Amino acid sequence: MNPHPYLTLVRLGRRRLRSYADYLLFQRHQARMLSEYLEQHGVSLHGREVLDLGSGLGGYTMEWKALGGHVFALDLATSSPAIKAGRIPFVQANAHSLPFVDSTFDVVFCASLIEHVRGPELLLGEVYRVLRSGGICYLSFPPFYSFRGGHEFSPFHYLGERLALRLAQRDRDVPDWLRNHYEIRSSAQSFAETYDGWGLYRVTIRQARRLLKQTGFKVRHFGTRFLPVNLAAVPILGEILAWHVHMILETDA
């Protein structure tokens, strides 16, 4: 295993909140690492129709385009400056009702999104619908009971939602450039009410596997993101030990 990408990941991660440009560098490096992971499991983006679902600040989207994908971005928020500058097709929409006809895409990226939507089964059903026969979905999320499962509320999420919200508000120092994107509602009484139109919901590995089976997805690979050891595969304890789970899913050919 080449350690250099991981050392770079740590370095960029420490700097990511300095500016929007620094955050894009961090996201794009992660995307390159993920593209290598996908290639190892037989998934190439070059020349493929790709949907970046929950495109956010746009770093991943930019990299998928640079890797040769015909990329379409979708987010609940307005398009990011990076996506606009890259002239990447974008639509502002809800992931529960994707504005695409059936069998539109070869690959759908759904990274760190499923834990932010109410009704994850609706999201997965829509992803399956817009994928072509034999299509691929990259799905990732931090299991709720892991140390990163509470996102910006970690590690306070172990203490219950109301206390976690109060403690996170007290200790949270958000840079000005990011504040307009992800400002926590001061009136929020639960993780689900945290943001404007979306929140944080409890998603576990066990729940995700059950929903994927119900939806019809086959799991080509299942692992712990950016770690050579698959802690997510450890029964029960994987829910706590795996900081971030990722899966390569495929539809029926």
Q: Where are the predicted features?
A:
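Conserved N-terminal segment of class I S-adenosyl-L-methionine
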Residues: 1-97, 109, 124, 201, ...
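Helix-loop segment at the mouth of the active site in Rossmann-fold oxidoreductases
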Residues: 98-100, 117
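A short SAM/SAH-binding and catalytic strip from SAM-dependent methyltransferases
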Residues: 107-118
